[in-house]
Regions:
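Short, charged N-terminal beta->alpha structural module
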Residues: 71, 75-96
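Substrate-recognition element of Asp-dependent hydrolases with the DxDx(T/V) motif
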Residues: 17, 21-48, 62, 79-84, ...
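Short acidic low-complexity segments
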Residues: 96-106
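Asp-based phosphoryl-transfer active-site loop
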Residues: 1-16, 20, 33-34
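Conserved Lys-Pro-Asp/Glu-containing loop-to-beta segment of HAD-superfamily phosphomonoesterases
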Residues: 76, 169-188
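Substrate-recognition/cap helix-loop segment adjacent to the acidic, metal-dependent catalytic center
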Residues: 42-61, 130, 146-161
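Glycine/Thr-rich beta-alpha phosphate-binding loop at enzyme active sites
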Residues: 137-174
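A short, structured active-site edge motif that brings together acidic residues
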Residues: 58-68, 103-105, 139
Length: 188
């Protein structure tokens, strides 16, 4: 099941969700929690679910673009430049991928920031023009909160794609790697 806007909005659980999950569990139906969230680690998402649902949640049942990055990209890189939250950077550091300055990185990963930085985006465009590999965690233009829709990291991705006439590979639900993760791991 999806999370943002389906199970909760911001820090508010949607009515009936806990009861539905309990019923599914009573009927031995395996539940995977899928999200395009690009600013929180899987453990942070697990903590949020446990807090909101007051239920135990298996972290291995949480699938995010960061899980796809860990599984399919991280072992191929020595270093990366992160455009995203501090939480995102902390998680990437746990994967033994060195976070470095943009100019010396092997690749760029676009996540979500609370406040976008135009100069940083222009520098990223310049590096990609010069051949730097780039990935994004998702292409969501917005994400739901209890205060309404907020700009997502897809807005930054779109700026880069439009400027360079390229298609940035997404590790999120709209990309090819997300569904292939489910196939590879026999998740149905």
């Amino acid at each position: 099941t999806d999370l943002d806007g389906t199970l909760f909005k911001g820090e508010t659980l949607i009515d009936g969700v806990r009861e539905a999950i309990l019923e599914l569990r009573e009927n031995n139906i395996e539940i995977y929690f899928t999200t395009n969230n690009s600013s929180q680690s899987p453990s942070e998402i697990r903590e949020k679910l446990v807090s909101l649902l007051n239920l135990e949640i298996d972290i291995n049942k949480i699938i995010t673009p960061l899980i796809i990055f860990k599984d399919q990209i991280s072992k191929k890189l020595n270093s990366i430049y992160i455009y995203g939250s501090d939480e995102l950077k902390k998680y990437i550091e746990t994967l033994n991928v060195k976070i470095v300055n943009l100019s010396i990185s092997d690749a760029i990963l676009i996540g979500r920031k609370e406040i976008n930085n135009e100069i940083e985006i222009k520098d990223i465009i310049s590096q990609v023009q010069n051949g730097k590999q780039i990935f994004c965690l998702n292409k969501d233009l917005t994400y739901p909160t209890e205060y309404g829709e907020q700009p997502g990291n897809g807005a930054v991705v779109k700026i880069i794609e439009d400027e360079l006439s390229i298609n940035i590979q997404s590790l999120g639900k709209s990309g090819e790697m997300y569904p292939s993760y489910f196939k590879i791991n026999n998740i149905t």
